[in-house]
Amino acid sequence: MSKSVYWCPHCGIPVIENKICPVCKAEGEIISTNGICNPVFVQEKRLLSCIIGEDINNSNVWYLGSSQYLVDGVRKRISYGEFYKAKRHLECADKILIDAVHDDTIYNLDLYIKANQRYINELIFEAEIYVTDLVRELKESSEDGISYIPTVSFSGGKDSTVVSRIVRDALQNESVIHFFGDTTLEFPSTHVYVDGDFRVENPFTPMIPSETENDFFKLCNVFGPPSKFERWCCTIFKTSNLNSEYQNLNGNSLTFLGIRRSESKERQKYERTQKHSKIGSQINAMPIIDWYDCDVWLYILYKGIKFNEAYRWGYKRVGCWCCPNNSD
């Protein structure tokens, strides 16, 4: 799986899947083939400035994956490892935290959106058609009065944030039920986002938290820490709790998830629609399964959606803080 992103040196913007910039017609230079080209916000720029000993706070910076960054059109490898081993982050903490306002400024944002607008609109159209077609198909094929109720599995991360908006726009319904699976291991910023910004931005969207009675650290003593090969935590802290919530629905759940194939080799094998899931009364649907990081961020910036604060600080994933899949 691959997706190419080009850099237009004239406009100073990434252009997705188009070597010729749609704005200025200049030929771009390829900067990514893995579909990763994420905006870097002021908070992360401050940290990066401390790491490399160079002020890039006012630079045009994009993250390309695997510790690779594009700084004013020049690729740089910026590794956190040695920085943390030397405990230099303790020295820089005050500099990073001072006046840490919500500055979402992205260089040449208008040009970036203009250059990629046709591309993202095609992705949006396809995803929304998938949602409406699936809902209609299940409604027409329902037997014995069994109905499927559209819901969104919401984690507070960028992918479920995008899926939430796509599903509600496609169905023209702000009242689609959202289930937030609280594993008790979320970043504080996730709770702030779910209980604050998301609710304020979407006052008519019900958010039902699913809480667990289990203690993660006590279970670690029983099963051992979760690993990529033994993720018992997902079953105990997410699946079982959500299953209890789904039982309260007046019908079965058509659950829309923010899962993408580009996230891992395991997920490359996923079907877009899973009619046989871990939860018997549930069908899983993944509208953005073939999207890449660059697509998700383009959508967020294009729609002007609020998002989890942790991304501003450089986190690439904002699920459980101790997740074994958090390798980048």
Where are these regions (language model features)?
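Residue-level signal for threonine
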Residues: 40-41, 187, 306-308, 328
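Immediate flanking context of iron-sulfur cluster ligation sites
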Residues: 225, 303-317
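Short metal-binding segments enriched for Cys and/or His
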Residues: 28-34
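Histidine- and/or cysteine-centered catalytic micro-motif in compact active-site loops
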Residues: 260-262, 312, 326
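ATP-dependent adenylation/nucleotidyltransferase module used to activate substrates
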Residues: 2-28, 42-47, 51-302
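Local cysteine-cluster metal-coordination motifs and their immediate loop/turn environment
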Residues: 316-328
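Short, conserved alpha-helical segments within structured domains
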Residues: 156-159, 315-319
